[in-house]
């Protein structure tokens, strides 16, 4: 129910979330009108409206429910490993345990050495059990590690970070913010969320400089916290790849300061260059739509 206190974004979100179904009869009426119409100008107008409506239906109901596996080989990492990187499932308002169960079913056959979750696991899950939402993670076969993102840390979002950490632990997921662990010959370190002011990387100084290092963070902008080293790869999410990947326009709304988008990029900072891989993520925030940017599981083949 839309209250008078809702702002324009809330009204738009409610309209897309709950009123989007009305686009189906609208599309049907437009197609019927296009078939019956004989006037050229009217047919062109109807065709344009029909195409726009069908594109909306795809972005609202089809693309957000796709799950694509993107396979990337990264050379020069200092070691060999098969890593699954996911981020931004945003369980809560738009997606739930059923979607996560499908994600797990796609990950398990990939025979990964580890699964890394780069934050934003939730999106306003008020009144929903976190244990129930994240129960499918218990079925993951590889060891699984996570950090939290801004929506998990009230930036913005409800105060759920402690409960979320407990729910993840209960499913066998290790939250590794501010600490390191070994993954198939790599040192894996986790950074807390940047918007929450928790991405201090000072603890990485104790890792030997010749040790291949993977850093898991939510926000790729955390690259500016790192010191260059021979073998270093930052793995992140947060950008959604634009979510609505309309050429040029999506770049104007990417929530980053250092120009990160998706895939492999390099951050050129005052200390030197940092290698970054950003996943497009699995879920949606703001509006329950994706366009030209389907939910993705990144399978990274790391090579020396």
Locate the predicted segments by residue:
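Membrane-embedded segments
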Residues: 78-174
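Active-site metal-binding loops of divalent metal-dependent hydrolases
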Residues: 87-91, 119-121, 150-152, 179-180, ...
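Conserved beta-sheet core of the metallophosphoesterase superfamily
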Residues: 220-299
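Conserved acidic residues
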Residues: 113-115, 142, 211-214, 232
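Non-catalytic terminal accessory segments
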Residues: 1-68
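Structural motif
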Residues: 83-85, 116, 188-190, 214-218, ...
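Binuclear metal-dependent hydrolase catalytic cores centered on His/Asp/Glu-rich metal-binding motifs
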Residues: 156-173, 179, 184-217, 223-225, ...
């Amino acid at each position: 129910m839309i209250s008078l206190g809702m702002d324009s974004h809330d009204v738009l979100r409610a309209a897309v979330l709950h009123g989007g179904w009305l686009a189906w009869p609208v599309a049907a009426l437009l197609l019927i009108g296009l078939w019956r119409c004989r006037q050229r100008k009217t047919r062109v107008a109807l065709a344009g409206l029909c195409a726009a409506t069908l594109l909306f239906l795809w972005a609202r109901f089809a693309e957000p429910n796709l799950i694509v596996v993107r396979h990337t080989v990264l050379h020069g990492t200092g070691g060999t490993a098969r890593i699954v990187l996911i981020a931004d499932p945003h369980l809560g308002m738009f997606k739930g345990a059923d979607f996560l169960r499908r994600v797990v079913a796609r990950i398990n056959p990939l025979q990964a050495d580890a699964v890394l979750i780069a934050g934003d696991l939730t999106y306003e899950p008020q009144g929903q059990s976190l244990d129930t939402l994240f129960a499918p993670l218990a079925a993951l076969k590889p060891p699984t590690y996570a950090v939290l993102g801004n929506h998990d840390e009230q930036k913005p979002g409800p105060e759920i970070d402690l409960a979320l950490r407990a729910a993840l632990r209960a499913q066998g997921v290790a939250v590794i913010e501010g600490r390191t662990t070994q993954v198939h010959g790599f040192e894996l370190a986790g950074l807390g969320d940047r918007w929450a002011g928790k991405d201090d990387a000072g603890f990485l100084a104790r890792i030997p400089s010749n040790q291949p290092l993977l850093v898991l963070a939510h926000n790729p902008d955390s690259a500016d916290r790192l010191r260059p080293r021979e073998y270093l790869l930052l793995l992140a999410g947060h950008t959604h790849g634009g979510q609505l990947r309309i050429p040029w326009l999506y770049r104007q709304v990417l929530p980053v300061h250092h120009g990160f988008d998706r895939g492999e990029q390099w951050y050129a900072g005052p200390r030197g260059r940092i290698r970054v891989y950003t996943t497009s993520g699995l879920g949606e925030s703001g509006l329950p739509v994706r366009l030209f940017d389907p939910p993705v599981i990144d399978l990274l083949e790391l090579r020396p």
